[in-house]
Amino acid sequence: AFSYGVLEALKRTEIENKAGQTLRLLDQIDIITGVSGGSFTALAYRLYGDKLFDEYEKRFLKRDVQGEITRRTLNPANWAALSSTGWGRSELAANLYDEILFDGATFGDLRRSDGPYVAVSATDITSGSRVIFTPQNFDFLCADRGSLRLSRAAAAPSAVPVVLSPVTIN
């Protein structure tokens, strides 16, 4: 909610440039970084632009997302998948995030829209080091960032150990 409030304040704040034109401060932002809950806001703003302000609260902020994840975890229909290797509660959460917020969008979809560059950070659980979801880092991993669903990118930095499983990037 904090990151969304910051974007709202930047949207409302007007500045005057040297030519005397009034501009929104939000339109002057070149990069947005996000970690944990802020990754949802950063990615959604990059995907939707100003439409975010019409839909984000209803679609995401004011929903009981934790409750929905818990209900899905307790649903016997999901138990086989949850007990398999390579698929865990974070994948279940990412599927929910797709349904309620990201609509299956990938990093590749972000290339087709205007807006600030978005850098989402997570933690590599094996080394404890920070991983920033940049093209360069994905090239190093020999992974295709363009096909990575935004929902999985948002799930990675919010994957609290024990509560949500780590997100694996192949």
For the regions a protein language model found, what residue spans apply to each?
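Patatin-like phospholipase
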Residues: 2-87, 91, 134-137
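Secondary-structure transition/capping residues
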Residues: 17-18, 108, 165
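Short, contiguous clusters of charged residues that form electrostatic/catalytic patches at enzyme active sites
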Residues: 4, 8, 95, 99, ...
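Glycine-centered secondary-structure boundary/capping sites
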Residues: 14, 101-102, 106, 126-128, ...
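Active-site gating loop/helix substructures
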Residues: 66-83, 95, 112-170
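Generic, well-ordered alpha-helical scaffold segments in large soluble proteins
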Residues: 9-13, 100, 157
